[in-house]
Structure formats: structure tokens, C-alpha cells
A protein has these predicted regions:
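Residues lining hydrophobic/aromatic ligand-binding pockets adjacent to catalytic sites
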Residues: 1-256
Length: 256
């Protein structure tokens, strides 16, 4: 990992009516993605979890965003929640075909497992092998049951180059394993899931972690899912600011 990594920071989703005035300044919904793309470096698409999007929708999102902007998409819940990773290949191929419209702007596919899904190494291995059919992008998996937090799972993910999603929330534990040159973080709200803001001290701590991963040559994706009351966009902007400040301070020390 000789090169420095890249950071992509944003929110989980952007179509929140509660943000219309305070964050979007009253702009119409059709302008919200462009607005986010002018302020964040990446965004996580949450809508894909609930409903498969058309290839035309993905193509439109690609056109509406600048060249260096990146998307992470949350894979549809059919495979992760309904099928619990059983018979994964057909669902993976379907997801791959729909998301192709994003082209090179698709950076990561997130696979979120439900909280009641306990560790099943056989299914995980089958799923990980099936993901080789989608080598053109990176993949991360979010475990919400602690039975998955063990060395055998981490080794499987390392073998197949799948990242652990470090998922911070009040309602389930965080697993901070790092298994690839990608670190994927979801910040759901530490005190109250989906509804609490991150304090400045917490954001500074995440900024320090991100800076360390970047120095190690890892790409870092951080998406805020504490969308209530507009916490997510404010926290994302603050984390971007903190990372930029750390970069300036590091450059100044090198000059001195």
C-alpha cells in the first residue's frame, strides 16, 4: 500500500423532506443530488435497498454528479434479508446489471445483514465466492449480530477481498475489523440510532481514524445515517472539514 488512500464522505441517502429548508434551502427535490455532490465527495444510495432502480435512474445520477464523485449503493434486501444469503448468484447478477449505469462512479456495494441473522460461515463463503461475478467494484458487508465478529469470518473476507462495514449505532455493536484496502464506515447515531448528532469530540476521533487509514493507503468511505433533524449532512460537512484541516496541518509540519 504505497500510495495514500482517498476519502469519500457523505450521507446515506439524500431525499429527506425534513432537510428541504435547513439544508437544501428550499430547493426542489430534483436539485438535491446535485446540491449534495457539490458539498460531499460521495454518497450512499439507500433507496436501492428497498426497491430495485432502473438502469436509466443510475445513468441520470451519473450525469448529475461531477467526475470525481463516487456512489456506494446499498444492495437490495431480497438477498440479505429475505434469502439470508441463500442462492446468491442470480441476485448478484441482477444487481450488477441494474447498477452498471453508474459506470466508474460506482465505488462500493454495501450488503447489510439483518440484526437477527446469526453467523453462518457456509452461507457467507458461498456468498463471497458468488461475488467474484462482480469484480468490477468493491464490496462491504455490514454485520449487526455479534456472532459474526470472529477470526474465521474476518479471514473469509480477507480471502475474498470484502470489507467489514464498521457500523456505529446505539442498537447494535460495532466490529472494527479491517480486512481489505477499503474501510467502510456507517455512522447511524451513537447515542440514539438514526436520531442523534455526533459531538465534536466523536467526529475528531473518527477523523483521526480516517487519517490513519488513509496514510496506510486504504480508501475510506464514511456515510452518516443519523438523518433525523438534519444531523447527517451537518456531521458529514464537519468531518470533511476536520480531515481537510488535518491534511493542511500535516503539510505544514512537512514544510517546517
Amino acid at each position: 500500500m504505497g500510495r495514500g488512500g482517498r476519502a469519500f464522505i457523505g450521507t446515506s441517502g439524500w431525499r429527506y423532506d425534513a432537510w428541504r429548508e435547513d439544508f437544501y434551502g428550499g430547493r426542489p427535490a430534483g436539485e438535491w443530488l446535485r446540491f449534495c455532490a457539490g458539498r460531499f465527495t460521495g454518497i450512499e444510495v439507500d433507496a436501492t435497498f428497498y426497491r430495485l432502480q432502473s438502469p436509466q435512474t443510475f445513468q441520470r445520477w451519473r450525469r448529475e454528479t461531477p467526475p470525481d464523485f463516487r456512489f456506494a449503493i446499498k444492495a437490495n434486501r431480497f438477498l440479505t434479508h429475505n434469502r439470508k444469503l441463500r442462492e446468491p448468484l442470480a441476485a448478484i447478477r441482477l444487481e450488477r446489471g441494474r447498477a452498471a449505469g453508474l459506470g466508474a462512479k460506482l465505488a462500493v456495494v454495501l450488503w447489510q445483514l439483518p440484526r437477527n441473522f446469526r453467523c453462518n460461515l457456509e452461507r457467507l463463503e458461498s456468498f463471497a465466492r458468488a461475488l467474484h461475478a462482480w469484480r468490477s467494484t468493491r464490496h462491504a458487508i455490514e454485520f449487526r449480530h455479534p456472532s459474526w465478529f470472529m477470526d474465521e469470518v474476518a479471514e473469509c473476507l480477507r480471502t475474498h477481498r470484502i470489507a467489514v462495514c464498521q457500523s456505529d449505532a446505539a442498537d447494535w455493536p460495532l466490529w472494527d475489523a479491517v480486512t481489505t484496502d477499503l474501510v467502510y464506515v456507517r455512522l447511524h447515531g451513537h447515542a440514539v440510532t438514526y436520531a442523534s448528532a455526533y459531538a465534536q469530540s466523536q467526529l475528531r476521533a473518527w477523523a483521526r481514524k480516517a487519517r490513519r487509514w488513509l496514510r496506510e493507503g486504504r480508501d475510506v468511505h464514511v456515510y452518516f445515517d443519523n438523518d433525523a433533524w438534519g444531523h447527517a449532512p451537518r456531521n458529514a460537512l464537519r468531518l470533511i472539514e476536520l480531515l481537510q484541516r488535518q491534511s493542511r496541518e500535516q503539510a505544514r509540519r512537512l514544510r517546517d
